[in-house]
């Protein structure tokens, strides 16, 4: 399986999605919860969708974000990511 390095923003969103599983929240609400800008949230979500870690569906006119099976298995520890980037 190919390995991809993900950013801190993507890791934070993936950790959040592992806790809530599904959400109808907009980028602004997720950003406020995680202390990120809405544009950073959107960019991270797009990348996570490309990596097939989360999915985005249209549910009666609202965006539904769901974590995939691969996303559930993907364990991310922010401390390890920080260490690997700065060592």
Name these PLM-found stretches.
Residues 58-65:
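Short, Lys/Arg-rich nucleic-acid/phosphate-binding segment
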Residues 39:
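Key DNA-contact positions within bacterial/archaeal DNA-binding proteins
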Residues 1-13:
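Short alpha-helical segments that sit at the start of domains
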Residues 22-33:
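Short acidic, hydrophobic short linear motifs in intrinsically disordered regions
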Residues 73-87:
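Amphipathic alpha-helical dimerization/coiled-coil segments
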Residues 15-22, 79:
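Short, locally clustered residues in the helix-turn-helix/winged-helix DNA-binding domain
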Residues 45-46:
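Short, hydrophobic-biased segments on the C-terminal half of alpha helices
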């Amino acid at each position: 399986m190919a390995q991809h390095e993900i950013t801190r923003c993507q890791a934070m969103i993936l950790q959040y999605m592992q806790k809530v599983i599904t959400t109808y929240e907009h980028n602004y609400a997720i950003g406020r919860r995680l202390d990120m800008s809405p544009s950073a949230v959107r960019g991270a979500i797009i990348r996570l969708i490309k990596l097939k870690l989360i999915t985005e569906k249209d549910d009666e006119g609202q965006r539904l974000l769901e974590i995939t099976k691969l996303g559930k298995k993907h364990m991310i520890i922010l401390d390890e990511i920080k260490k690997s980037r700065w060592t």
